[in-house]
Regions:
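Chitinase-like catalytic core of GlcNAc-active glycosidases
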Residues: 96-121, 125-295
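Extra-cytoplasmic beta-strand recognition segments
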Residues: 449, 495, 505-539, 567-571, ...
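Short carbohydrate-recognition loop motifs
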Residues: 477-506
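Extracellular carbohydrate recognition and processing domains
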Residues: 547-579, 592, 849-865
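Conserved aromatic anchor
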Residues: 632-658, 963-965
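Beta-strand-rich modules
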Residues: 692-715
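Extracellular fibronectin type III
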Residues: 712-728
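A broad "non-catalytic interaction surface" signal
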Residues: 731-916
Length: 965
């Protein structure tokens, strides 16, 4: 069940508000964050068709409610308008390319089907960040119109189109849905309207209402060739064109690898109706079908069409060995756009990321994409020549990081970088990727972990354009640049600069088209050196005006300590009306051999001031999803008051944020009426989810939302809702394992029941220890207890002595099925320095298994490992951890989610008289301590004179240490 709180009551409206929350909600029986069970494509589209017949372009609130769609509807909407791309081929870093060639990433949006890409507390999620080369994104893992609005926000702010979901049709797996779909969409109009098909206008209106860019098809059935299927989509595309809906498209994938005069009419378009589809041509024998490009080009030209929306298909799993030379060896081949596909519930980029813990895994995920897009050197100025052997894409674990794509020329060798940063100041980034192990505000942790792609900042135009000083065309690598989640100023990530340079390096981050519409241009920059005392940063912000080759350098100066520091710096040389074309950083020459600097916030602004729409009175609704004695998780909806603004509401029921001067919304929290206000999230959506906010059970929680103007200074008043704590008995929160969490996060192509039944550890014994292990079981002790496949054998303690040699025997259960530890990697770890991690070089004590194949010895007869305890192992409590994870996926290391895995821990004690090694410093030791300050521009307001009135409780279920409502 759920409990809802709102501030007062709202007057009923004839048409649905833009946010689906202004109502008294019935209790929900869903124990999940999002409930998509009421969603049925035909019913949704039927609503839009009926609305159009009634003279409206979108349904009423009551009509949506009639099919069960209420609060969660806003999570599939994006109010972020797609930004225009600023093109100038003369400014592209790589010149020997077709500057108009386009890349379509037909990939999943988030890890998992259904709601994987929606806001959550899953830090180790997919934060794709190469929108700067991507024209179109496919959202392959969602049904029609169900792609997460948070991902569409991220795509649109970077100028990328994104479909709202996909329909699958496969002739070998036909459950009747293909015929039902054909019957539905090809229903003819009988009421004399302008359209031949009953639902053609509904398709367009629905996409516009939800804020996405159309529909995607996996057409491996038969209906895509029929005249009515083609005719329907031709009419849909014509309607979108006639209504001037920019970016609307229809993706079409079939098994055809090329176009011909005979198939172009149903795969792409014709001279009478124009281009109907974004056409994804199939790969052939799992490789780019370059041989078909000349014939495809001829067929397109013969039909009088353009090549703008024809893409040759590439199977992403084969990124490291495809016909890249052949696809780029003449002008005909270079005219062909490329689409990368792979695969159904997670992208291959995300699947093949590697690391020893979630933070390093996320860091290496970004580096893997940087190699794929910018080239092996992670700099578009220095790339291997285009070749057909890019280096290994899939590797076993983090020890092979340097082998991944180490000969990649990168997509930068084939496509121009893209920028949508404009048209006027201000510009701001917190280098947020859209997730974090913790949520930071001005360097201090407020809660965590979190995931929300709507909070991903505009990505850098270049990853990473490191050059010599004052020369954008000369490659340099003295300074390394990388994203990190170890620390942040605001949100969950920052960039780290490291290395050594005597002459200095420039890091050109963004190409822009930012006009200073007012005077007094200034820069805000937040950095962290990690050094005590006063130290020179040797760091400047650099700006370059349009029409100039000279950089304007704005030095940061010194830091006064090891914590985050922010400064506002005056900029001279940019007058009102002038345009900033490039923004970057400069590390000036330094004698330090280990330059280290975190950059967490960069803003370039002027005196522009724009009033923002406030929230509509009493519109904020908060739904409590989980609660313990120490934390609260909430889902929120709200609606801005756009009545005084000129908006497109009457067209499609959509109000874009830029129409009401909204850049984003801040989510605020306070514990008790007099408590300190904390920022716990940001979003561009009109809804969000914030999980695990810490607070005492006795305190009343206050959740607030305010809008932030496009001037990034003006804010609306905060609208607050008071949430009294549940008065019944709440569970204590799960005690955090200081060694970090290891659990099964995916069952791969198996089932949960089979994994629990068949994947478990049968025996772990030792010899030679002071106190040996003798763990032996005949079934999975987690069956019926936990689905996480992690077992702490607390009653089996291993005691060892410094310098002692011991032998560990490990045997997995031999299930005789494909769900078995036989098909896993198995790694073993011991903490030797007492810092509650396993990251020292000698703390990985054994690795077993083979990439993409089984290892029978894991289950029969079992593994044997002999180790010597280091003489300097720290005496005291320790831990033995053994982690199994699918051998077709990189091993996650000692912490993080496994695939079809099983993890087991044993308590340890190390004895001896030798001095123990000093505990290695971890990233948490370097974070700023203390409580986060209050958000800016609060001006003493409380806004909580009124409190929530609808505070009835429904039933509560307690499971896994959490109360779910």
């Amino acid at each position: 069940m759920s409990k809802f709180y709102k501030l007062g009551l709202m007057c009923a409206a004839a048409l649905i508000p833009m946010s689906m929350m202004a109502q008294d909600y019935p209790a929900s029986t869903s124990s999940q964050i999002y409930d998509q069970t009421p969603w049925e494509n035909f019913k949704v589209l039927e609503l839009f068709a009926k609305a159009y017949d009634d003279g409206r372009n979108y349904p009423t609130k009551a009509e949506f409610e009639s099919i069960g769609l209420t609060m969660d509807l806003e999570f599939v909407r994006s109010h972020t308008r797609q930004r225009p791309i600023y093109k100038d081929a003369s400014k592209d870093i790589v010149q020997d390319i077709n500057h108009d060639r386009q890349l379509w990433c037909n990939l999943p949006a988030g890890y998992g089907k259904g709601t994987g890409g929606y806001p959550s507390t899953e830090f180790d999620q997919d934060v794709f960040s190469f929108w700067n080369y991507t024209n179109l994104y496919g959202a392959w893992n969602y049904g029609f119109l169900l792609a997460p609005g948070a991902w569409i926000d991220a795509a649109h702010k970077n100028g990328t189109r994104m479909y709202g979901g996909i329909a699958f049709f496969e002739s070998w797996n036909d459950d009747g849905s293909e015929g039902a779909f054909q019957k539905f969409i090809t229903t003819k109009n009988i009421n004399g309207t302008d359209y031949a098909y009953k639902y053609s206008r509904a398709f367009v209106n629905a996409a516009a209402f939800f804020g996405n860019d159309g529909y995607n098809y996996n057409s491996e059935g038969t209906i895509y060739q029929t005249s009515d299927f083609v005719g329907f989509h031709a009419e849909v595309k014509k309607i979108a064109n006639d209504l001037n809906i920019l970016g609307f498209g229809i993706g079409q994938y079939t098994m055809n690898a090329s176009l011909s005069n005979s198939n172009i009419g149903y795969l792409y378009g014709d001279s009478q109706r124009g281009e109907i589809y974004d056409c994804m041509l199939n790969y052939s024998a799992n490789m780019l079908y370059y041989r078909g490009v000349p014939g495809t080009t001829s067929a397109v030209e013969a039909a009088g069409l353009s090549m703008d929306n024809v893409y040759q298909g590439h199977l992403l799993v084969g990124l490291d060995h495809d016909y890249w030379i052949q696809m780029n060896n003449n002008d005909v081949q270079k005219r062909m756009n490329i689409v990368i596909w792979g695969e159904h519930d997670q992208s291959r980029f995300f699947q093949f990321r590697i690391g020893e813990d979630p933070l390093s895994t996320q860091s290496n995920y970004q580096k893997l994409m940087e190699k794929a897009f910018s080239g092996a050197n992670r700099n578009p100025l220095s790339r291997p020549e285009i070749n057909n052997a890019w280096g290994k894409f899939q590797v076993a674990d983090a020890s092979q990081a340097n082998e991944q794509l180490n000969n990649s020329p990168g997509f930068a060798s084939m496509f121009a970088e893209r920028t949508a940063i404009g048209p006027s100041l201000p510009f701001e980034t917190n280098f947020s990727l859209g997730n974090g192990e913790s949520y930071f505000y001005k360097g201090k942790v407020t809660h965590g972990p979190w995931y929300n792609m709507s909070q991903q900042d505009i990505v850098p135009t270049y990853r990473w354009l490191v050059t010599t000083k004052n020369n954008m065309t000369t490659y340099a690598n003295d300074i390394n640049v990388e994203f990190t989640h170890e620390d942040a100023y605001i949100a969950g990530s920052s960039i780290r600069l490291s290395g050594s340079t005597s002459a200095g390096n420039d890091i050109v981050l963004y190409r822009t088209n930012l006009k200073a519409t007012e005077g007094n241009v200034k820069v805000d920059l937040a950095v962290k050196s990690g050094k005590e005392g006063t130290n020179a940063t040797n760091l400047s912000v650099i700006l370059r005006k349009q029409g100039s080759n000279a950089w304007i350098e704005v030095p940061y100066g010194t830091t006064s300590g090891k914590t985050w520091e922010a400064k506002t710096l005056e900029v001279s040389g940019i007058a009102k009306g002038e345009v900033i074309e490039y923004i970057g950083l400069r590390v000036n020459g330094t004698t330090a051999s280990d330059y280290q600097m975190l950059v967490g916030h960069l803003r370039v602004s002027d005196d522009r001031k724009v009033n923002v729409a406030p929230l509509r009175e009493n519109s904020l609704v908060v739904e409590v999803k989980e609660e313990t004695t120490a934390a609260l998780s909430v889902k929120l909806n709200w609606e801005p008051n756009y009545d005084a603004f000129s908006t497109s509401i009457d067209k499609f029921g959509m109000v874009y944020n830029d129409e009401i001067n909204v850049d984003h919304f801040e989510i605020l929290f306070k514990e008790g009426e007099e408590g300190k206000v904390r920022e716990v999230g940001r979003t561009a959506q009109w809804a969000t989810y914030i999980g695990n906010i810490p607070l005492a059970q006795t305190a009343t929680a206050y959740i607030g939302v305010r809008a932030v103007s496009v001037d990034l200074k003006s804010v609306s008043p905060v609208q607050w809702v008071a949430i009294p704590r549940y008065q019944g008995e709440l569970p204590e929160p799960e005690v955090e394992d200081l060694y970090g969490k290891t659990w099964m996060s995916s069952v791969g192509n198996g089932t949960l029941a089979n994994c629990i039944e068949n994947i478990w550890v049968e025996k772990v014994t030792t010899t030679g220890a002071t106190q040996n292990l003798n763990y032996q079981v005949t079934s999975n002790p987690l069956k019926g207890v936990s689905e996480e496949q992690y077992y702490f054998a607390k009653d089996h303690k291993l005691i060892v002595e410094q310098g002692q040699t011991i032998t560990i025997n490990y045997k997995g259960y031999n299930s005789g099925t494909s769900e078995s530890l036989q098909y896993d990697f198995v790694n073993a770890y011991i903490d030797y320095d007492g810092n509650y991690s396993f990251l020292d070089a000698d703390e990985t004590i054994g690795k077993f298994g083979n990439l993409n194949q089984g290892t029978m010895a894991i289950v029969d007869p079992g593994l044997e490992l002999t180790i010597k305890i280091p003489a300097d192992a720290k005496p005291g409590a320790s831990r033995l951890r053994i982690v199994g994870s699918d051998a077709w996926t990189p091993h996650p290391g000692p912490t993080g989610g496994t695939v079809k895995g099983y993890s087991i821990d044993f308590p340890m004690e190390i004895t001896g008289n030798n001095p123990g090694r000093k505990a290695a410093e971890t990233y948490k030791d370097r974070r700023d301590e203390g409580e986060a300050e209050e958000p800016e521009n609060m001006d003493g307001e409380s806004g909580i004179e009124e409190v929530g009135v609808n505070t009835a409780f429904s039933s509560v279920t307690v499971a896994n240490g959490v109360a779910t409502f």
